[in-house]
């Protein structure tokens, strides 16, 4: 009788352990939303960055259509911008203000939505920096030149003499060169 009780209690314990084993993996492998996975990737970018300030998510491209398999790698594309918070700050980047004229980077790669899997493969490149782009002032049309006034009746001003020729003796002109001596062409008869 005692053996039957022991086997029944052992059966119950094994059933409880089986149920517990089925429940625990699903709780530990909770899937992240697409945005949460991207925010984790931004945190990893900040951890590995050698720059002075933290980066914060600026723009997130739409998620891929097939988000059924949480463990598979998903293509992603997003933009981050430099914040005013130093990299050593304990403050999360989402609470930091964007730095005026801060660096902007476009990140492209793959992420996973599985919380236990911390794999991501991203390549972030600096976009044309806002601080380097200055808006050009609008081009205004050139002003038209003023028309010359019509001559008015009345006395005309006396024109000033030009600085040339100067008064004084004129130089003697050089004589024209004479033809060279030598054979003369013979005229042809008509």
Swiss-Prot record:
Compartments reported by the entry: Secreted
Pyrrolidone carboxylic acid modification, residue list: 30
GO biological process entries: defense response to bacterium
Biased composition (Pro residues): 146-190
InterPro entries (UniProt xref): Cathelicidin-like, Cathelicidin_CS, Cystatin_sf
UniProtKB keywords: Antibiotic, Antimicrobial, Disulfide bond, Pyrrolidone carboxylic acid, Repeat, Secreted, Signal
PROSITE patterns for the chain: CATHELICIDINS_1, CATHELICIDINS_2
NADP among keywords: no
Residue numbers covered by the propeptide annotation in the UniProt entry: 30-130, 190
Cysteine pairings via disulfide bonds: 85-96, 107-124
Start and end residues of each stretch annotated as Disordered: 133-190
PTM field: Elastase is responsible for its maturation.
Function, as annotated: Exerts, in vitro, a potent antimicrobial activity. Probably due to an impairment of the function of the respiratory chain and of energy-dependent activities in the inner membrane of susceptible microorganisms.
Family of the protein in this entry: Belongs to the cathelicidin family.
Protein known as: Cathelicidin-3
Organism: Bos taurus
